[in-house]
Amino acid sequence: FVINIFKKMITKEIIRIASNTSNVGLNNEYSHKISLKNILCGDKITLELIVSKQRILSMRYETESCVYCEASASLLSKKIKKFNIQTIKNEFRNLKNISKNKDFKIPQKFADFSKLFNSDNFNRYNCIFLPFDAVIKALKL
């Protein structure tokens, strides 16, 4: 029974997303840096952001975390380059608010996150949002 639930939660697609390590590893080149820990489960993430002219140019990260946090950080590190700092806090807050509802529809801008933001992973909400929370805190938004 427990194994079946585990298989349902962690899909091959989530593992594939998490295994993309193109932005893993800190370079000690950043305009903003933070380490954040999820007090509920112990997941930890450290981010390095390079920001210029109100745009995030790059995000590098290291985690000591579950596959959900790793997958979320991997996707976010690729997508974040398209985000404007002026709108990022509201966009992340709106995403968090709608994601609290099990019947939510993901905004098109975050469509790549649909494998993570679904009702099967609802109990991993804090793990999935740890990278988002870290970005907001690093930017002091």
Model-flagged regions — what are they?
Residues 2-141:
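Domain-level signature for proteins that mediate thiol-based redox and metal-cofactor handling
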